[in-house]
Regions:
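Small/polar-residue-rich segments within soluble enzyme cores
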Residues: 51-58, 70-181
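Helix-start/capping segments and mature chain N-termini
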Residues: 1-55, 62, 166-172, 183-195
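Short, glycine-/polar-rich solvent-exposed loops and beta-turns at beta-strand/coil boundaries
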Residues: 12, 30, 67-73
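ATP-binding catalytic core of ATPases
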Residues: 59-67
Length: 196
């Protein structure tokens, strides 16, 4: 009898390149943050679903019933929250640990690397530098004009799981590494720009 396989395909973010001025000062950069994703098909019972929904709704101030509904989806990949900082990451790690210890529940919540765009010089040269949207795509200025150069290539993790949702042996996982974006060096000088 053939094993009924399901593929989980997870996207891994690529780090966007940094924009520098003529003297090497950072004008735009990406800092590490995390994305919280859930694999609802891996829940084995309602107790696990309720514990996960309670924990996630408390950490992120989300509606419990909305999160509980998400835990019932027949999906390997549901985004719970994007771009969380390290304090929230610690709470998620504690929740993952609690689910494993108290509910024998693992493989349902994951933290994936993500990036958040920062502009250390604030509005300085913002008309030139531009900005990115929530999907990290350049929308104005240098961020837009050099988007394909700055953005890099996202990676993927493809995992085969049997019909019961348990991971198959390691050989069924395929990783495609993400490639970080390129840096851009501008000819403008931030000290001169700030005096204009």
């Amino acid at each position: 009898s053939a094993v009924d396989l399901q593929l989980a395909d997870t996207t891994v973010s690529a780090k966007r390149g940094t924009i520098y001025d003529a003297n090497g000062n950072v004008l735009a950069e990406s800092a590490s943050v995390w994305q919280v994703v859930m694999s609802p098909v891996n829940f084995k019972n309602d107790k696990q679903r309720q514990a996960a929904a309670k924990g996630l709704s408390e950490i992120f101030d989300l509606e419990y019933n909305d999160v509980l509904d998400d835990t019932k989806q027949q999906s390997h990949y549901v985004v719970v929250k994007r771009r969380i900082e390290s304090d929230e990451r610690e709470k998620v790690l504690e929740l993952i640990d609690t689910l494993k210890k108290d509910y024998s529940c693992s493989g349902v919540i994951q933290l994936l690397d993500d990036y958040k765009r920062y502009y250390p010089k604030n509005s300085l040269a913002s008309s030139v530098i531009g900005f990115t949207g929530s999907d990290d795509q350049g929308l104005e200025g240098i961020e837009y004009e050099y988007d394909s150069y700055l953005s890099g290539t996202p990676g993927r993790i493809i995992t085969a799981q049997n019909a019961r949702g348990t991971d198959m042996p390691f050989r069924y996982e395929q990783n495609v590494e993400s490639e970080d974006g390129n840096n851009v060096y501008l000819t403008i000088d931030e000290t001169i720009q700030s005096n204009l």
